[in-house]
C-alpha cells in the first residue's frame, strides 16, 4: 500500500491500516517517514499515560483494569506494551494476547473497537521503551484514541525515558521488595506524577506508602543529594529538569489491589485530574514542546549519522584510530568537514 492510502485508512478509523502503519514505523520501512509526515498535524489530542516500575509489581494488570475503567467512562483506549526483545530476533517475547490476561471480559475487549493493543520489542534498548514508541503513540493519537497507555518493559534498569513520551507518568511499586531500595533507585522520585502501591493486600503496604510520602516531601536539594548516593539519572536531576516538569503538582500516592479492581477508580480519577491540571496551568504545552525538541534533535542526529556512514571515509579514520595515528577529536572534525563539503555539492 502507498503511504497516502495507509494514512487515509488510518484517519478514517481502519484498524488494519493502523496496524500496517505501526509495522512500517517499527521496522523502519522507507514509507514510514512519509506516513509520519502526513499524520503529524492530526496529533496532540490524546492523553498519553506511561506506567513504569520494577518487574512483578503488576503493571500489566493495572493497564488492563485501567482500560476497563476508561472504557466505562466512554474513552477510547490505545495500549502500547513494551516487551523485552529476543536477543536473537529483536522481536517481542510476550505478544499481544498474553498481556490482557487481567481483563474480566476478554472476548468482548478483543472485539471492542474502542480498544487497540500493540506490544513492541525494546530490542535491548535501555530506558524501558522501544526506539519507535513515540512514533507509534502519534499513530494511535491520529487514529483518535482518547487515552494511550504505555507500559514499560520493567527490566529493572533506569526507566526514566517514560517522561519523553508520556503526559502523565505513573510509577508502580509493591510491598515486600525493599521499599527504601524501590524509592531510592533509578530516579523514580523525580519522574512520577502519580505513585501507586499495588498489591496493597500484602504485608508492608502501609510502610511503603509512608516511606514514599516522606521521600516525596523532601525538597529539591535533598533529592539531588539522594540521586548522587543512589546513582539515579544524576545529570537530569541536578539540572532540575524533573522538578521543573511537575512544578506546582503534588504527586498523590494511591494504594491498589489491581487483580481485584481495588483503587482503580481512584487511580483513573488521579490521572484525569493531572491532565486537567496540566491543561489549566499550561504545563501540557511546555512538556510537549520539550518532547518535540528532543524528537527533532534525535531525527537530525540519526540523519547525520546516516550521512556519515554513506558519504564519508569514516572506516579509514577508524583504522587510523586503532593504529594510534589520529585521535577521536581530530577524526570527528574531519568527518564533520566531509559531511559539510558533500552537502555543499548537493
UniProtKB/Swiss-Prot annotation:
Species per Swiss-Prot/TrEMBL record: Archaeoglobus fulgidus (strain ATCC 49558 / DSM 4304 / JCM 9628 / NBRC 100126 / VC-16)
Family matches, as Pfam families: MeaB
Function statement: May have GTPase activity. May also bind and hydrolyze ATP. May function as chaperone.
Superkingdom, natural source: Archaea
InterPro entries noted in UniProt: GTPase/Isobutyryl-CoA_mutase (IPR052040), GTPase_ArgK (IPR005129), P-loop_NTPase (IPR027417)
GO molecular function terms listed in the Swiss-Prot or TrEMBL record: ATP binding; GTP binding; GTPase activity
Annotated protein name in UniProt: Putative GTPase AF_1289
EC number: 3.6.-.-
Amino acid at each position: 500500500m502507498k503511504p497516502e492510502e495507509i494514512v487515509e485508512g488510518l484517519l478514517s478509523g481502519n484498524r488494519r491500516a493502523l496496524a500496517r502503519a505501526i509495522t512500517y514505523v517499527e521496522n523502519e520501512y522507507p514509507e514510514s517517514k512519509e506516513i509520519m509526515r502526513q499524520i503529524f498535524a492530526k496529533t496532540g489530542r490524546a492523553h498519553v499515560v506511561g506506567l513504569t516500575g520494577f518487574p512483578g509489581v503488576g503493571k500489566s494488570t493495572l493497564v488492563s483494569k485501567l482500560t476497563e475503567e476508561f472504557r466505562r467512562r466512554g474513552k477510547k483506549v490505545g495500549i502500547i506494551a513494551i516487551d523485552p526483545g529476543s536477543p536473537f530476533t529483536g522481536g517481542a517475547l510476550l505478544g499481544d494476547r498474553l498481556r490482557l490476561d487481567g481483563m474480566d471480559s476478554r472476548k468482548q475487549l478483543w472485539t471492542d473497537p474502542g480498544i487497540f493493543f500493540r506490544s513492541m520489542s525494546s530490542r535491548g534498548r535501555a530506558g524501558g521503551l522501544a526506539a519507535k514508541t513515540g512514533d507509534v503513540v502519534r499513530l494511535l493519537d491520529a487514529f483518535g484514541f482518547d487515552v494511550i497507555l504505555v507500559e514499560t518493559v520493567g527490566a529493572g534498569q533506569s526507566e526514566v525515558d517514560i517522561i519523553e513520551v508520556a503526559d502523565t507518568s505513573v510509577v508502580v511499586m509493591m510491598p515486600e521488595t525493599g521499599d527504601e531500595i524501590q524509592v531510592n533507585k533509578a530516579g523514580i522520585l523525580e519522574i512520577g506524577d502519580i505513585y501507586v502501591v499495588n498489591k496493597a493486600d500484602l504485608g508492608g503496604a502501609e510502610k511503603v506508602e509512608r516511606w514514599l510520602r516522606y521521600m516525596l516531601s523532601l525538597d529539591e536539594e535533598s533529592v539531588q543529594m539522594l540521586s548522587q548516593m543512589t546513582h539515579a539519572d544524576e545529570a537530569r536531576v541536578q539540572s532540575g529538569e524533573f522538578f521543573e516538569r511537575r512544578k506546582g503538582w503534588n504527586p498523590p500516592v494511591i494504594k491498589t489491589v489491581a487483580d481485584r479492581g481495588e483503587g482503580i477508580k481512584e487511580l483513573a480519577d488521579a490521572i484525569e485530574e493531572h491532565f486537567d491540571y496540566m491543561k489549566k496551568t499550561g504545563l501540557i504545552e511546555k512538556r510537549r514542546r520539550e518532547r518535540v525538541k528532543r524528537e527533532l534533535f534525535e531525527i537530525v542526529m540519526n540523519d547525520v549519522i546516516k550521512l556519515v556512514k554513506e558519504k564519508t571515509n569514516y572506516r579509514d579514520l577508524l583504522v587510523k584510530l586503532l593504529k594510534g595515528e589520529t585521535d577521536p577529536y581530530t577524526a570527528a572534525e574531519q568527518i564533520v568537514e566531509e559531511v559539510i563539503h558533500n552537502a555543499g555539492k548537493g
